């Protein structure tokens, strides 16, 4: 999903994977040089892209550094998933973990944040 934005459909799929399929780990992975984050920082797009960038802007606030902004966006998505009562239940009962990560396009490395 562009910009790691989460809506009810994605959250429902994540809840299903955790509660019905037994997924032990949910990783929210952003990446460096993210076009959606760049657009949220530098532009005010029109059309449906605005729904994506508005959600990113809410997550990153006034942060203008693209890497830091992408990390803030990942952490926001992580928090949104963890706010789900279904996810909280599986975390408590089954030990589910939700973590954030950043993939570096330039070298293929992943940082867990």
Outline where the language-model segments fall:
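Conserved functional hotspot residues or short segments at active or partner-binding sites
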Residues: 28
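Histidine-centered divalent metal-coordination motifs
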Residues: 31
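Divalent-metal-activated hydrolytic enzyme cores
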Residues: 3-23, 36-113
């Amino acid at each position: 999903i562009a910009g790691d934005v989460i809506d009810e459909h994605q959250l429902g799929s994540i809840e299903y994977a955790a509660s019905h399929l037994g997924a032990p780990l949910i990783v929210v992975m952003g990446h460096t040089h993210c076009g959606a984050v760049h657009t949220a920082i530098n532009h005010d797009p029109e059309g449906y892209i605005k729904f994506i960038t508005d959600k990113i802007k809410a997550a990153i606030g006034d942060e203008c550094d693209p890497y830091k902004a992408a990390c803030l966006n990942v952490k926001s998505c992580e928090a949104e998933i963890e706010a789900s009562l279904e996810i909280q239940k599986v975390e408590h009962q089954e030990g589910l973990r939700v973590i954030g990560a950043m993939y570096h396009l330039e070298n293929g490395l992943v940082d867990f944040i």
